[in-house]
Amino acid sequence: MMKWVEQYEKMSEKDKEKFQVTANRLLNKTFLVYGKDKDRQYYRFVEKNLEVFQGYFSIAKWDLLHHKRLSVFQLYNIEEKNRYRFNLQETIFLLILRLLYDEKQKDLQLTRDIVVAGFEIQEKYMALQIKDRLPSKEEMRRILRMLSGYSLLELKTGDYKDPEAKYVLYPSLKMVVDDARLDSMGELLGMDDFSIELEESDEDLEREDEEQEDIETEDIETEDITGEGEH
């Protein structure tokens, strides 16, 4: 019997339930971000049982990566299946968010959240002169909500269509839009389509977190983990 299976069998029934919920969350969202309040308990649970999760996902050709410096877990399909392919408009928003993340990060201490307003996203969109007008409010809402479903950002105040809405940007953006893609940004945006991809389960990725909460165990431990992960 493989070691991770033995470790799983030794778990309490309560922890096995937590394992199921956490594994499903990873499949739905691709990332677990320590800095995101709703992810933190799952991040800690994965960190505590990393070998079990990696062994479990490896059976289906998934690799669970731990970006310790950024405190992010990323689920990656080794065979490059179950991928979501972003269209051009979605790609523009991804690149804008990554640019804003970098700009804000320079001005903040490492312990603080990176927050942007809706109007900052709109201003950056127009400043790049990619298109001569903003997308509709409904289209912006759809894109931002979809990206939130991947734990790339989180709406904190207001509505997705509100220019005064506040969003927290997460370091998982750096996994989706890496430095190489930023360097070739002009060339990429000249395409009709773009090959940035994310892992995708068969479930609807635009589900609100509250729907997921219906199956969550309320008393998942939140004690600090003493492993190697950086927080």
Per-region residue spans from a language model:
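Eukaryotic partner-binding/assembly regions in large regulatory complexes
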Residues: M1-E79
